[in-house]
Design a protein with these regions (language model features):
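Beta-propeller fold recognition
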Residues: 1-375
Length: 375
């Protein structure tokens, strides 16, 4: 098990849980940006401190921010050797600290938590947004789909400033090559920030789509006329290959399906987007079931920003983007929806609505409803 310490620490650890009744510490590492020191704890708990100037590449945890990116464990081929690795974003920096956070780490689990690769994620120049990778990275492997005709994984993630990336961890092409697929054009004023994992799905033609939304969790109650968050669905026409030299796209190459009757994207469009309502923000990852994608959304309380706002769940055709339904869930923020056996389960931080709608009911702070038929 590999896990991070959350927003309070810049640290990850690994436990051997072969015997769940007697877990064994494997390693821990930590970044201390205030003192420019990285620390490593071995299996027996022995601690080693190294300053940034002396650190070797295999112990370079200096880009590690708040440990909020959930590690994904996969097997990749490094040279001729198969290795089990943990991959995760470098984490949070409060949207302010430029020295750390904007990277992805690939860690050798069995070999003492050494860094196999630290992949820097470029910060966009000129938008005054300090970048980071706080969401988890999402691998696509042969274990998850038969369309993955490679060893290892193609990895997708969105960074803090709403850029979508594709990372090559396969045995084909250049290992660790990073490619920008899409730029959500984040600015200080539009507040398009990504905190939540992208959700992936294949369409009927085995094209891969990445779904994610924006919303500044650091400023969840913010209200002004310049905030312009969006839902995005971006198509990767090159999947399952990693094609070099691809030019990234923006919303200009996607279909705006905000308005009713906008129509579906054509073959020439690289995806779709929806403009959220005034001050609205996405509060979790998307969920997909039966050709419908669901997004949790949040609108702050305009009259009293100290009180909870309203939680919503919107449903859209997954390749079309047309809005099938938007449900007022009640007071507070909604979690990422979980879909199980045709039912949607979604938590809410405040009081659920008294009349959510037909087919929906609340048990304390858990709201349960029926999925919507796809289009």
């Amino acid at each position: 098990a590999v896990f991070g310490m959350g927003e309070g620490e810049h640290s990850y650890s690994a436990l051997d849980i072969t015997d769940i009744n007697a877990p064994k510490h494997m390693w821990t590492f930590r970044n201390d940006p205030s003192n420019s020191i990285v620390s490593y704890w071995s299996a027996n708990g022995q601690k080693t401190d190294v300053d940034y100037a002396s650190v070797t590449p295999e112990r370079d945890y200096s880009k590690l921010g708040q440990a909020v990116s959930t590690p994904r464990i996969i097997r990749i081929k490094v040279g001729t050797t198969d290795k089990w690795v943990a991959i995760f974003g470098a984490g949070g920096n409060g949207g302010a600290a430029t020295a750390y956070g904007s990277a992805v780490y690939v860690i050798d689990i069995a070999d003492k938590g050494k860094v196999l690769k630290k992949i820097d994620v470029p910060d966009k120049v000129g938008n005054s947004v300090v970048n980071s990778v706080v969401s988890a990275v999402i691998p696509v492997t042969a274990e998850t789909t038969t369309t993955a005709v490679y060893e290892g994984a193609l990895v997708y993630f969105a960074d803090f400033e709403s850029k979508l990336w594709k990372l090559n961890l396969t045995n084909k092409g250049t290992l660790y090559e990073l490619q920008k697929l899409f730029d959500g054009e984040a600015t200080v004023t539009n507040q398009r920030r990504v905190f939540h994992d992208v959700t992936l799905s294949l369409d009927d033609n085995s094209k891969l789509w990445a779904f994610f939304g924006t919303g500044d969790r650091y400023n969840i109650a913010a209200e002004n006329s310049l905030i312009n968050n969006r839902l995005f669905a971006i198509k990767d026409d090159n999947y399952p290959t990693f094609k070099t030299g691809v030019t990234s796209i923006t919303a200009a190459q996607c279909k705006n399906v905000t308005s009713a009757g906008a129509g579906c994207p054509t073959a020439a469009d690289d995806g779709w987007f929806v403009n959220l309502d005034a001050n609205e923000k996405v509060s979790g990852s998307a969920a997909i079931f039966d050709r419908v994608v669901y997004f949790p959304r949040y609108i702050p309380n305009k009259l009293n920003p100290c009180n909870p706002g309203k939680a919503f769940l919107s449903a859209h055709g997954y390749t079309c983007g047309n809005t099938l339904k938007k449900i007022n869930l009640g007071d507070g923020m909604a979690t990422t929806p979980i879909i199980y056996k045709g039912k949607i389960y979604i938590g809410i931080s405040g009081a659920p609505g008294s009349s959510i709608g037909s087919g929906w009911n609340a048990v304390d702070n858990l709201i349960i409803g029926n999925t919507i038929s796809g289009s």
